[in-house]
Structure formats: C-alpha cells, structure tokens
Amino acid sequence: MTKYKVGMVSLGCDKNRVDSEIILGKMSNEYEITNNAKEADVIIVNTCGFIESAKQESIDTILEMAEYKNNYKCKLLIATGCLIQRYGDELKNLIPEIDIMLGVNDYNKIDKVIKEFIEGNKEASKLLNYSDENINEGNRILTTQKESAYIRIAEGCNNFCTYCIIPKIRGKFRSRRMENIISEATDLASQGVKELILIAQDTTQYGSDIYGKKNLHVLLKELSKIEGIKWIRVLYCYPEAIYDELIEEIAVNEKVVKYLDIPIQHISDHVLKLMGRKTSKKDITDKIEKLRKSIPNIIIRTTFIVGFPQETQEDFEEILEFLQEYKLDKVGVFKYSREEDTPASKMDGQIDEAIKKEREEKLMLSQEKISNDINKLKVNKKYDILIEEYDGEFYKGRNFEMAPDIDGNVFFESPKNLEIGEFVKVKIIKNMDYDLIGVVEDESCK
C-alpha cells in the first residue's frame, strides 16, 4: 500500500517549530513527509495564537490549505497549536473544512487519531486536550538548517504577565527531565548539529519545579560534554531569574556563547508594574551591569513592548534614554497587542494605534544607530563563522553574537569551496546596521 504523504505548515515562534518537528518525527514511520503541500494527502497547520496578527495569519493559512482539498491531493486537513488550543470550540464550527483539531498537549496522539479517521472513526475528528501536565517529546525531523537546532527545555509559564495569554494556552511551567534533554541533544549532534539553542517560555526557571532549585547552569555543563556541539545558546532568560551560578557557568564554559536573550519588555517602573513584571528598572540595570562585569564580551539581546495601556510619553522616552545609556547589542520592538482574556485588555488608557506605530518606529531608529555604532567596532576583528548558506557568490553565516532569524548575518566570499554547516575564520572588513561583510582569513577555525 502506498504511503500517504504528509505536509506541514508551521507558524509562529521557535517553540512552535519544535512541536512541528516532533509531529513530523512521529509521522515519519507511517507516512512520507513532503515539503510540497500540493503533493500532500494530509496537511497539518500548526498555528500561532499569541497576538492578533498571528491569529489572522493562522486563520488565513488554514483557509488557504482548505482550498487544497478541492484543488490538489489533500484528503485530510489537521489544525493544531496555540490558536486551536485557545479557540478550538469556535473554529470547529466556523471552519468545517478542518477534519481534525489537536490541542498543544495532544501531539503524542496524532498518528493514532489520523489512523482512526482514515478508517472511518469520525468521532476522533475534533480532539482537544486542555491538560497542562504533558510535555511534547520525541524524535524530531529538523526543519532548520542542519547545523543549528532549537531544543526546548521546559513548557508552560508561571509568570502571568498582564498582556500575555501563554499561561492559559500552554499551562503551568514544567521542566523536562535533564536526561531526556541530554539524550535529545546527543541525537541532534549525531545528525551534524553544531549549535544548540535552548528555549522555553522562561529558560532561567529550568529545574525549579522538578529539582527544587534552578538548574540551568547544571544543564549547560552537561550539554557542553556532548561531542560535536560547538555552540550552546540560551534564549528567553527573564532578568529577575538570572542567578549567580548561571552567570558563572556562562563565563567559564567555552561552548556556551557569551550571548543572552533577556526579554525586558519595558524599563519604566510605572509600566513594568502595570505589565505584572516581577522586576524594576534598578533590578534590570543592576543585572546588566553585573553581567557585563562578570562576562566582559557578553552580547545582550532584548525586546520591548511599546504602546502598553497607560504608557505615557515620559514612560516611552525612558526606554530611549535607557538604550542610549546602556547601548544593548540587539533589540526587538513590538507594538502592544490587545488580547482578550488578559488583564491588560481590560485596562483603561488604551493607546491609539498611530501612537504605537510612531513609538515603534522611533525606538527602532534609535536602536539602528546604536547597532551601527556597535558594528563599526567589529571591523578588522576576526570571528569564527558558522556557515549557513551559499548563493553562488556569497556565503552567509553567523558569529557567536548572532542568533538565527532574529539577528544579523555575516556575508563573505571565499576563493575555495566551503561546506555548509562548518566553521571558518572570517575577518570583518565592513559593517552595516545589522549585518557584517567579511573575507575568509583562514579556511579552518582554530
């Protein structure tokens, strides 16, 4: 019997990407995986439901894939992910073309449900699980470049920021067992992965629930023992949860890149309190100063939300002043999105969209100049570059200061053919606002 072909459309964040890879891994034994949705008998849309624009993209994608049932080979349309977890009861009536719905903790059942559906059990067609006890784990089919892989170390969140719906969708914070993470990382290394990117809603809380204390520093130490792994990168570190042993491990561990993604979200105490953040401006600046003192070459990335309810012009300008003083290396800016069922959505003082957009643009322009000034200092320096692409003329890669997709890239030429997924020494000869231009200094990294 010919195997059904399965296609996946994965939307949203890198945590969603890991879910998609686990789903594909689970499907690969019984089904053929295809990257061409037009060839797929089964199409899975893994949705995002975090902010309004993501919800709309998810709905548009589901409707687009529903057309494939009429125009191409698709016989079965499955919708999964955060949008389904959040609005599944409504969507099963609004979009009847969806044959199967799965909540964010149901992925371990997907092969069984598909088999039952194909065999005629339509009772399995609308399955939602609102339990927050499960953690999706299993063999993955990577959808990233072969040299880098995200590895989720925990699921859920206990922070309950007033603007965020994630705890209601993903449930309470739950760490994975360390031995399971090590096993997965070892398997990824055997596939040629050189860079592990640790993710969770709050990576700094890793271990606090199952080991009785924060254990991210221990996990980093154990991961660094895996042969073949050269870089270990940590994203989503809440500033108030960064602790001394973690700082020390990052400082001394050669495989842990000196880079931290720390979602500050705001710097005004007034807005931080409204956001339900468990920190203050002084705590944040003290933590940045401590990190820079302990790890002199550390790269700090952060994100800000502008246009939060009751954010004054003075609150906004406080972010600008903070960035001018502390000159963070990487900054992302988001306009506040009013999400139903969150405390912030019910607050007085909602900000006009035009003001949000103006503040977003002003903040990004300010950071653009800061980034350019920082990048100027990199000219004539040499870096180990992880090669990711070649377009026939230029190679593209990243140094340790750059996370995939969210930061810049290094572009360079080489007189010799280089292997994608390998490291090469590159001298920077020119900077741009976010990217760097270089030349190969030595075809082997020392």
Swiss-Prot record:
* Protein function: Catalyzes the methylthiolation of an aspartic acid residue of ribosomal protein uS12.
GO molecular-function term, one example from the UniProt record: aspartic acid methylthiotransferase activity
Cofactor(s) annotated in UniProt:
[4Fe-4S] cluster
User: What gene name is listed for this protein?
Assistant: rimO
Catalytic activity, per the record? L-aspartate(89)-[ribosomal protein uS12]-hydrogen + (sulfur carrier)-SH + AH2 + 2 S-adenosyl-L-methionine = 3-methylsulfanyl-L-aspartate(89)-[ribosomal protein uS12]-hydrogen + (sulfur carrier)-H + 5'-deoxyadenosine + L-methionine + A + S-adenosyl-L-homocysteine + 2 H(+)
Kindly give the InterPro entries that the UniProt entry links to this protein: Elp3/MiaA/NifB-like_rSAM, Methylthiotransferase, Methylthiotransferase_CS, Methylthiotransferase_N, Methylthiotransferase_N_sf, NA-bd_OB-fold, Ribosomal_uS12_MeSTrfase_RimO, rSAM
Q: Which SMART domains match?
A: Elp3
Q: What are the residue boundaries of the MTTase N-terminal domain, all occurrences included?
A: 4-119
Q: Where does [4Fe-4S] cluster 1 bind?
A: C13, C48, C82
One protein family per Pfam: Radical_SAM
Instruction: Write out the annotated subcellular location.
Output: Cytoplasm
UniProt record similarity statement = Belongs to the methylthiotransferase family. RimO subfamily.
Give the cofactor note text.
Binds 2 [4Fe-4S] clusters. One cluster is coordinated with 3 cysteines and an exchangeable S-adenosyl-L-methionine.
Could you say which EC number(s) this protein's record lists?
2.8.4.4
Could you tell me which residue ranges the TRAM domain spans?
A: 376-442
The signal peptide, as residue positions, is none
Which Gene Ontology CC terms are recorded? cytosol
Q: Which residues form the Radical SAM core domain?
A: 143-373
Biological process (GO) annotations held by this record are: tRNA modification
Principal location listed in the UniProt entry: cytoplasm
For this protein, the record's NCBIfam families field holds: 30S ribosomal protein S12 methylthiotransferase RimO (TIGR01125), MiaB/RimO family radical SAM methylthiotransferase (TIGR00089)
State the name under which the record lists this protein: Ribosomal protein uS12 methylthiotransferase RimO
